[in-house]
Amino acid sequence: MAEKAKKKKNGGGGNQRIAFYKLFTFADRYDIVLMVIGTLSAMANGLTQPFMSILMGQLINVFGFSDHDHVFKEVSKVAVKFLYLAAYAGVVSFLQVSCWMVTGERQSTRIRRLYLKTILRQDIGFFDTETNTGEVIGRMSGDTILIQDSMGEKVGKFTQLVSSFVGGFTVAFIVGMKLTLALLPCVPLIVGTGGAMTYIMSKKAQRVQLAYTEAGNVVQQAVGSIRTVVAFTGEKQSMGKYEKKLEIAYKSMVKQGLYSGLGIGIMMVVVYCTYGFAIWYGARQIIEKGYTGGQVMNVITSILTGGMALGQTLPSLNSFAAGTAAAYKMFETIKRKPKIDAYDMSGEVLEEIKGDIELRDVYFRYPARPDVQIFVGFSLTVPNGMTVALVGQSGSGKSTVISLIERFYDPESGEVLIDGIDLKKFQVKWIRSKIGLVSQEPILFATTIRENIVYGKKDASDQEIRTALKLANASNFIDKLPQGLETMVGEHGTQLSGGQKQRIAIARAILKNPKILLLDEATSALDAESERIVQDALVKLMLSRTTVVVAHRLTTIRTADMIAVVQQGKVIEKGTHDEMIKDPEGTYSQLVRLQEGSKKEEAIDKEPEKCEMSLEIESSDSQNGIHSGTLTSPSGLPGVISLDQTEEFHENISSTKTQTVKKGKEVSLRRLAHLNKPEISVLLLGSLAAVIHGIVFPVQGLLLSRTIRIFFEPSNKLKNDSLFWALIFVALGLTDLIVIPLQNYLFAIAGAKLIKRIRSLSFDRVLHQDISWFDDTKNSSGVIGARLSTDASTVKSIVGDVLGLIMQNMATIIGAFIIAFTANWLLALMALLVAPVMFFQGYYQIKFITGFGAKARGKYEEASQVASDAVSSIRTVASFCAEDKVMDLYQEKCDEPKQQGFKLGLVSGLCYGGSYLALYVIESVCFLGGSWLIQNRRATFGEFFQVFFALTLTAVGVTQTSTMAPDINKAKDSAASIFDILDSKPKIDSSSEKGTILPIVHGDIELQHVSFRYPMRPDIQIFSDLCLTISSGQTVALVGESGSGKSTVISLLERFYDPDSGKILLDQVEIQSLKLSWLREQMGLVSQEPVLFNETIGSNIAYGKIGGATEEEIITAAKAANVHNFISSLPQGYETSVGERGVQLSGGQKQRIAIARAILKDPKILLLDEATSALDAESERVVQDALDQVMVNRTTVVVAHLLTTIKDADMIAVVKNGVIAESGRHETLMEISGGAYASLVAFNMSAN
């Protein structure tokens, strides 16, 4: 349903573009000044062409009518005017380019910021139904570039060209009205073709954008859940989805190229036919109306430079089409008024809040699942200062109560009251600031531990942070980390174990010092010892606060002032534990009995933690203890910490990094060409077409010089010659009609294929990186998504537009010099001497612009990560009113690239102005030199114009290429960044086909003398000489303190990492010698925080089986995981979308789907990392039964805090100080007096 709604939204009807002027909605006064100066300068710059044609007319008459002796004197008068024109053109073109580039950068940065700000202020329902992180990042990195392109220098260029057009026609009317009127009908033809083409192009641009946004979602999901993807060997699946989206974009891009070529081709035919007609009709005007040759040429050049200028508006129009299409969705979001607005400052603010909560007759459905009724007349009262616990089955709506109190959603009917006032009447930010939330899956941001904690209170002092950490029992493990509070936690907190993350989240809530406390399974990720200490901290915290607790473990809620049992959308029982336990038939009593049934185990259950406590005490004294604060990742799969382990280490890494990028820059263009090798035939044909297209320019110059000569011939000869040259011009137009569509179409194929190949290869390489690569914050999902979308698009411009232009211009230059030298070698030599000035000017433009791009892009990537983090954790951002904090951080990351953009604008303006200045100065010098040669009888008037037109058209070609410099430079940066990805060689490569495949897998596992440290935390030893043997079919449970490395064992078995020394064997074969994808197929992993993809429930379960599963297999697996009944009760059953990271489901529901996925895989080895921690007692019992059945004849490794699940294990191993301290069956270990395991259990019993 959500999917359908989304599709409808994205692709649905209407013309999805905004009006062009609306792009500038967010301009401030400074921008308006810049745009006015830029526009006036562009208009003035556009008039240089008409002025030049006036001077050209004067010049032609001087050359045509002056006698040889006075030609130099007369020409020098006109040449001085050319120098004035040069100065004028230099200044206005500088102002045009720099003003528009600077304002483009300013406004696009503002749009990025406004878009993120608006996204952050939206109600949570918007994220459930209308957007996701991938889309937001795609829009902020890809779409804003298109918008910036359409509102920067392209607007100036467009204004300049239109001004040239208007100026040209004005001059033509003044000089020769009759001839101009005769030529006028050609103009609508030119304009009409351009308009039709732009319309079609914008349609195609929308299709391309939509496909890329969807491709971005695939990247976001895969990289954000990379451990799940590789554990289920889902790389090919992700690639398949990605390539499907790329194929749609590819087809649209090719059509775009074809239509643009046809449009330009038709336009050029019209232009050249106009030339032909003008020559023929102009000749008649000379004979009949006494026009001069200069007049006719003036009219022709004025109309044609005007008409050509209109033709050249195409790239700008394409840009405007792409920009207005990209802006449509972004501006629509910016304008969206949220139902619950965090920025709305109206609403009540009380001087003091007591904390009485009441839900009165509430009816509620989630926006993403409007067909599932969650609450039907739900009522609950929580007096201030009281603790109320909500219990009930997984999915009964306990967490929904918390969402309604936080005002993430509003009820359909009924009221949520605080202190007797309807929640809707309060100022949203103020009321949220009075509520502290700790959720079941704590969300941390990809920054330091300190930064994560101060989300609770902006200006918290060090002392306050320390106190909060002590209360949350988190200071011990943080003190052991080399960087302490400055340790990076990784994307989604992957560098920490579940328990460590939860304690930081609790510290954050403690720091907020809220009046109302909402605890959603707040201690579910903790081991018994941490849970007891944190529970004590929470009890202190709850004093004189209104607290609502959602819990599965009933031990944690017995002391609550009131317990409410939630079932089928209502409170069906409430009272204290002692009151309700008296009714043996009550639902609460039954729940308690269910857990009592496993009470003995529960005792053990809480146990591993005694060991934890003693370990913590032992190692807290010695900073360098072997276990100095291991960090494991959330999925239990261990991760890493930021690069800045030590200054030296950090610098080494960054210096090698810059070296690679630099090296990449040297080779990138040649390598890019190599990537386009399969399209060599297409490129050759395209280049051939470009060459012919290029030769047309000097040939046109040659024809013009011949034409000028005929205007000074006797009437009878003029009549015949004019018809002949007119037909030659028509032939030239027909040539263009063939070669331009060919050139554009073929280069579009090559460019689109290259983009597709680069995106595909890069994503494939990303998917097959080893996990430690993703542990580096530089490779987070937001950054990778931004790199794939921005870099591939930028690189395409080198192959498509730029390569075509280079071939075309080279042909123009070579053709021009051949024509010049055959005319008069002296004149040509003179032209050759001044030409280098033009080339150097172009070269220096490229050099100047180099060096700004790379740095700025890196910063925008960092900014993308800030946005990605915030959007994927939107509930946490909303709950902690952290919208402003996120915006400040984003702003900080954008400041530097914005400054770079300003510099780039000024430099580009200087170079662009310089090119015009040089062009006209050179022409002036040429006129003087030419007239001197003519006066001295070393050249003729005809030869001079043949050389002159050849030179000017070449110069225009070179200047045009040099304006492409920003594109070439951006593409080089992007290419370096792409080859950075393509060249990274993973140590553990899942794409490798090498390695043995065992004919039969028994499942014997052995870890022999394993030592291990995380690659990015080389200063912390996790294992030192760890040995463990697991026989085939055995169930082995790992216990130990939070962060002792239990989950690291699972990571090593899955080969997410390789040990530093020692061996890991499967059936006596070292796992490093086995084929990696095959090895992972033998293992089924269920992690502590299950990762689901933003798809249907059915496809999430089917993900477990390579090559897809039948409906029957999916249902069987769901039944085994005790999730089939719940799925069947949903209106869309297995077709229900789970939302981003599974937000539409409760923790228990997600976990059961993850278990079904692992069951479907039917693995030989089962790895359960806290697999039932998120389940309530009822679900846990049934899932545990299911797991028990699944474990039969399978080797199983269990990591658990709840010892119910491990008492019956064939072997229990205690992980302590980097080795296995004890191992054996429960009974055996209990007999070791003073043993780690026995003391855990004893501690647990007393705690219970």
From Swiss-Prot:
Domain ABC transmembrane type-1: 35-322, 683-970
Keyword Cell cycle: no
Residues involved in ATP 2 binding: 1040-1047
Subcellular location(s) of the protein: Membrane
Domain (ABC transporter) ranges: 357-593, 1005-1242
GO MF entries: ABC-type transporter activity; ATP binding; ATP hydrolysis activity
Keywords associated with the record: ATP-binding, Glycoprotein, Membrane, Nucleotide-binding, Repeat, Transmembrane, Transmembrane helix, Transport
One term under GO cellular component: plastid
Glycosylation sites: 473, 652, 720, 779, 1094, 1193, 1244
Transmembrane segments: 32-52, 82-102, 158-175, 179-201, 261-281, 299-321, 682-702, 722-742, 813-833, 834-854, 914-934, 939-959
UniProt membrane topology term: Multi-pass membrane protein
Pfam family, one: ABC_membrane
Primary location recorded for the protein, binned into one broad class: membrane
Residues noted as binding ATP 1 in the record, renumbered to the chain: 392-399
Superkingdom classification of source: Eukaryota
UniProt-listed PANTHER family: ABC TRANSPORTER B FAMILY, ABC TRANSPORTER B FAMILY MEMBER 9-LIKE ISOFORM X2
Homology family: Belongs to the ABC transporter superfamily. ABCB family. Multidrug resistance exporter (TC 3.A.1.201) subfamily.
Stated name of the protein: ABC transporter B family member 7
Gene field: ABCB7
